[in-house]
Amino acid sequence: QDAAKGEAVFKQCMTCHRADKNMVGPALGGVVGRKAGTAAGFTYSPLNHNSGEAGLVWTQENIIAYLPDPNAYLKKFLTDKGQADKATGSTKMTFKLANDQQRKDVAAYLATLK
């Protein structure tokens, strides 16, 4: 995992995200270690909020697994927690990052943001 390369890949994410302020997507400073759906001042989709309520905390590993298909990841998380009834709707995040190495690099970069 290479945070410097991840910073370059993150430029694609800046259409919707910044480290220090909410935009279309939530601020990502401090995302690693934060409960899903809890960035201050951001209104999340029920799917994302429910995932946080069910115990999803963002780790580098979770971010790597989330990025290829955010909706599928959150729905599987809730279903695995026995909360399939709350695994409805969709997240606001439509971008998907398919490349495995880029996902690892972005997760490493996000871990540096405070």
UniProtKB/Swiss-Prot annotation:
Stretches of the chain forming a coiled coil according to its record: none
PTM comment: Binds 1 heme c group covalently per subunit.
Single annotated GO MF: metal ion binding
GO terms classed as biological process: photosynthesis
Keywords of this entry: Electron transport, Heme, Iron, Metal-binding, Photosynthesis, Pyrrolidone carboxylic acid, Transport
InterPro entries cross-referenced by the UniProt entry: Cyt_c-like_dom (IPR009056), Cyt_c-like_dom_sf (IPR036909), Cyt_c_1A/1B (IPR002327)
Pyrrolidone carboxylic acid modification, residue list: Q1
One Pfam family it belongs to: Cytochrom_C
Binding site for heme c: C13, C16, H17, M93
PANTHER family tied to this protein: CYTOCHROME C
Protein family (similarity comment): Belongs to the cytochrome c family.
Reported function: Cytochrome c2 is found mainly in purple, non-sulfur, photosynthetic bacteria where it functions as the electron donor to the oxidized bacteriochlorophyll in the photophosphorylation pathway. However, it may also have a role in the respiratory chain and is found in some non-photosynthetic bacteria.
Protein name: Cytochrome c2
